C-alpha cells in the first residue's frame, strides 16, 4: 500500500477524538479495565500497534477512555475505542443512548472531513445494523477523496457493552495500486470482532 494511502487511513483513524499523537501512548498489549476486553499482540489476524489512553495527561479525559489500534495483513487499520462518555451505557445497539452517541460520532466525522481538506464526503442517509459473531452494532460506511485524489473509506460501528461504548472503525483505501473493497473490510471484521468479544 502506498505511503499516501497509509497516511490517509491513519488520518481518518485518529480523527474522531482529536489528535491522538499528543496523548499518552503505549505499544504494550493490554486489557481494558472497564469492559475486560483483551487487546493482545494479535487479534483475529490483525497486529496490535498501540493504545492511546485519553484519561492520562495531557488530555485528562477519562470519559474518552482508550483507543486500541491494529493493522491487518492487507494494511487496513482497525481502531477500537472503549469509553463511557461520562455515563452508564446500556448493552446493545438499539438504546437511545447508543443511537444518540452514534449520531454525534457521524456529525463529528462530517465536520472533521470538511476541515481536513478532503472532498466528496459520501455516506448513506440512514445507518444500519451489522452483526459480527454474537455482537450487533449500529454501523455505517462513509468515504471521502483525499487531497491526493484517492478515495478512502471507513466503516464505523458502535454498541453498548459492559456499561461502555465500544466503537470500532476500519479504514481502507482504493488507488491504482491497492483495490480494497467493503468485502475485504467485512472479512477482516468477521475475524477480528468475534475474537475481541470471546
Model-identified regions with their sequence ranges:
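Signature of long, low-cysteine stretches enriched in small and polar/charged residues
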Residues: 111-156
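N-terminal "mature-domain start" segment
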Residues: 23-74
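Sec/Tat signal peptide C-region and signal peptidase I cleavage site
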Residues: 18-22
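A short acidic-to-branched-hydrophobic micro-motif
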Residues: 65-104
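Positively charged n-region of N-terminal signal peptides that target proteins for export
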Residues: 1-4
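Bacterial N-terminal signal peptides
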Residues: 7-16
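Short, surface-exposed beta-strand/loop micro-motifs that present aromatic residues
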Residues: 68-69, 152-161
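Surface-exposed amphipathic alpha-helical segments
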Residues: 167-198
Amino acid at each position: 500500500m502506498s505511503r499516501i494511502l497509509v497516511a490517509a487511513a491513519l488520518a481518518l483513524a485518529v480523527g474522531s477524538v482529536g489528535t491522538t499523537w499528543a496523548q499518552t501512548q503505549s505499544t504494550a498489549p493490554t486489557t481494558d479495565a472497564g469492559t475486560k476486553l483483551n487487546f493482545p499482540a494479535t487479534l483475529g489476524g490483525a497486529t496490535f500497534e498501540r493504545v492511546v489512553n485519553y484519561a492520562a495527561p495531557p488530555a485528562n479525559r477519562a470519559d474518552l477512555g482508550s483507543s486500541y489500534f491494529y493493522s491487518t495483513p492487507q494494511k487496513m487499520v482497525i481502531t477500537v475505542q472503549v469509553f463511557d462518555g461520562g455515563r452508564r451505557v446500556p448493552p446493545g445497539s438499539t438504546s437511545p443512548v447508543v443511537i444518540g452517541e452514534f449520531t454525534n460520532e457521524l456529525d463529528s466525522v462530517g465536520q472533521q472531513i470538511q476541515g481536513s481538506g478532503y472532498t466528496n464526503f459520501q455516506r448513506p442517509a440512514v445507518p444500519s445494523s451489522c452483526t459480527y459473531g454474537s455482537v450487533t452494532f449500529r454501523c455505517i460506511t462513509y468515504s471521502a477523496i483525499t487531497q491526493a485524489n484517492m478515495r478512502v473509506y471507513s466503516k464505523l460501528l458502535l454498541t453498548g457493552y459492559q456499561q461502555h461504548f465500544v466503537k470500532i472503525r476500519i479504514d481502507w483505501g482504493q488507488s491504482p495500486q491497492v483495490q480494497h473493497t467493503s468485502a475485504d473490510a467485512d472479512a477482516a471484521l468477521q475475524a477480528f470482532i468475534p475474537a475481541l468479544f470471546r
